[in-house]
Amino acid sequence: VKINNELSAPVASTVGVPQGSVLGPILFNCVMSVLPKLLRDFGVGCHTYADDTQFWVSFDEAGDFNNEATARWRISQAFGIISKFMLENHLKLNPKKTQFIPFSRKTDAIDFAPLALSSDVSISPSSEVRNLGLIMDSKLNFHAYVSDLRRNCFFHLKRLKAIRCFIPQGQFATLVHAFITSRLDFCNSVFYRLPDNLISRIQTVQNSCAKCLTGKKKYDSATQARIELHWLPIRARASFKILVFAHKVVHQSDNAPAYLSSAFSTTKHSRITRFNCDNTLKGFFTCRLSTVGARS
């Protein structure tokens, strides 16, 4: 371990490292990096984040028994691959933390039976799952996530209001950003296409924070408070984040993900146009129907 210019004495590691060691997360990621390739070779999509592993199987026509049976078989085989992989690497699969959720259109109702992980362990389909802090439901309407977000934000705002008179304004603003607005900005790209009734519920949280920071009263204008703080409304804030991210991807910025940058291709016109730019994007496909899959 090297900190600044100081280097610790070398220690031989034959099996693993003590829990809490700085090498623990790195070595764990090295071991788990093999798992996504094993699942993708089997035709199952997968991605990992630290100790959180997610895999999925997609199929068409929810009412088709053959497609559904094939998907269930592939999921069961994927669980077998994961169990075998963990057994070989001295790890243990925790059935209590293992969940699966079927996603479908609002018009298609999928009634999945419990999946068997082993001869004595099975898991039932969940209506809601937490994906790295984001609560996802089977219809992707995010009602549960909005309710959970409001509950947590107002809980912290109530506690911060109790100590506001003891903290300078600058430090109080830092606490509000750390405990509340950071939650509003987390995964706020999903707010872009939410209906107005859900956006208004999230907007009340931002309005309360703005009034608290500017010293406004309950019935004062929240718009004026946001203007004083240079805050965009929730929907505009989500749009701005998406536009900034898209600009980085299109212009091949250093911190733009390569898997997204490679999906965009530019073209050059054969004649001079009013908009003469080297970064003109090629046209993308258009959707005839406004379905969930098309909007994504």
At which residue positions do the language-model features occur?
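Hydrophobic/basic alpha-helical segments
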Residues: 1-296
